[in-house]
Amino acid sequence: MAVKIRLRRMGQKKAPFYRIVVADSRSPRDGRCIEEIGTYDPTKDPSEYHVNEELAKKWLSNGAQPTETVARIFKSAGIEK
């Protein structure tokens, strides 16, 4: 099973916020996830995010691949493999 760390869209139309989730790469964007590890709100200025660093590091060490956007969020949060 290929595991990805990616964003799950939440919120209303034209007012999105995202949850950072660990999910199977074959599941749909807003489908079933394995675990939620944070949130990201791009509508605020500046963008706001909260990440559980312990869970993020655990999943990265287990081989989960972050998407480009999540990798950028992790980099600004100081989370690396």
UniProtKB/Swiss-Prot annotation:
Annotated protein name in UniProt: Small ribosomal subunit protein bS16
GO cellular component terms, semicolon-separated: cytoplasm; small ribosomal subunit
Lineage start: Bacteria, Bacillati, Bacillota, Clostridia, Lachnospirales
Keywords, in A-Z order: Ribonucleoprotein, Ribosomal protein
GO molecular function terms noted in the UniProt entry: structural constituent of ribosome
Recorded family membership: Belongs to the bacterial ribosomal protein bS16 family.
Keyword Glycoprotein: no
Any matching Pfam family: Ribosomal_S16
Keyword Cell wall biogenesis/degradation in record: no
Gene: rpsP
Gene Ontology biological-process entries: translation
